[in-house]
Amino acid sequence: GARPARPAMNPADDSAAAPADPALEISLPTSLELCQLGLATMVDIRQAFEIELKGAIPDTVHIPLFEVKQLLGHPLTEDEQDILDAGRPTPVDVQGFFTTINRLHHVHDQIVLIVCNSGRRSLYAAQLLRDMGYPKALSVAGGFQAWKKLQAAAPAPAQP
């Protein structure tokens, strides 16, 4: 038999039961499409050393999340502190962070796509931005890992 249509997600309904707001997350292929259309900008929130070690995603703005969390006065978990301590501190100031996000979100009316290594930290960051008044913040599901898989599956044209 035909499956009943799923009710439309109500973005205002944030029941505490759901671990992550589904409307907070976006798939990588959709993210890349939005970027190509000029509707969105990807913000890589990994620490600088992670990007050096694992590689960067082209055309992303880099804002390390943990520095931002600290700047905003949010406590870091032990793991986060370890990661923060593992790399050289990235010079980030709150003003610069907000200037960047404001420019993307308000001036250019961009969807802010947050990417981390696996898609966990970016969910937190997207929620943080939403709470701070940036409704178009989304977390890229799967993060950098998903991007690498996608690259492996579809060989990119050779870079000059």
What are these regions (language model features)?
Residues 3-41, 48-113, 118-160:
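Rhodanese-like catalytic fold shared by cysteine-dependent sulfurtransferases
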